[in-house]
Regions:
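Generic recognition of flexible, low-complexity loop/linker segments
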Residues: 7-9, 30-33, 82, 112-113, ...
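Substrate-binding/access-modulating region of protease and related hydrolase catalytic domains
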Residues: 51-142, 146-148, 160-175
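Subtilisin-like serine protease catalytic core
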Residues: 1-68, 87-88, 121, 161-162, ...
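Short beta-strands within extracellular/lumenal beta-sheet-rich domains
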Residues: 4, 145-153
Length: 178
């Protein structure tokens, strides 16, 4: 049987297939592997790539996989509606990362996942990332008597060819000089 006759698209990078295996993979005792819930039913959302104007704005390279936050939220809504229709509990697994945003839980997507996680029978699982030690983030805190802090930003040669995006997050009264 051709598995691709059952679905309208293919997972070309393997990330979704890998996550599905972690979530509900069959037990392979000889390889010491079992998915978290091997008997689970899966409902999968295939996200479309981010629109060109957003990729251009954020200088996202053509070969980089990127999605839009609003599409992710619509996918979550679809899963919620599907779980309701079948009267099933739902675990929403998001294995999508970003280096953008404040990471404070205040983005629209963060709010949606937090809200759905408050419903009975729904759990949200969000990957913590796999870029430890790559120095994509800097956090600093200033005391009242600190007037400035120099922070060096190193941009790789390839990234610098097109430009780069830098986000600065602070309280409203703070000032930055760049």
């Amino acid at each position: 049987e051709d598995p691709f006759s059952l679905v309208p698209s293919k997972d070309t990078d393997g990330h979704g297939t890998f996550l599905a295996g972690l979530a509900a993979g069959t037990a392979f005792p000889l390889q010491n592997f079992t998915g978290a819930a091997p008997m689970a039913d899966l409902a999968i959302v295939k996200l479309k790539p981010a629109k060109k104007y957003l990729r251009d704005y954020y200088l996202i390279p053509e070969e980089t996989v990127a999605f839009q936050e609003n599409d992710i939220m619509m996918g979550i809504k679809y899963l919620r509606v599907t779980a309701d229709r079948f009267r099933r509990p739902l675990v929403i697994l998001l294995g999508l990362g970003t280096n953008y945003g404040s990471h404070t839980g205040t983005s629209p997507l963060s709010q949606v996942t937090q809200n759905y996680g408050g419903f009975f029978g729904i759990a949200t699982v969000i990957a913590a990332g796999n870029e430890t030690g790559l120095a994509h983030h800097y956090a600093g805190r200033f005391s009242a008597d600190t007037s400035f802090e120099d922070v060096e930003l190193r941009v790789g040669e390839e990234e610098g060819k097109r430009g780069f995006i830098l986000e600065l997050w602070s309280s409203a009264a703070d000032l930055y000089t760049v």
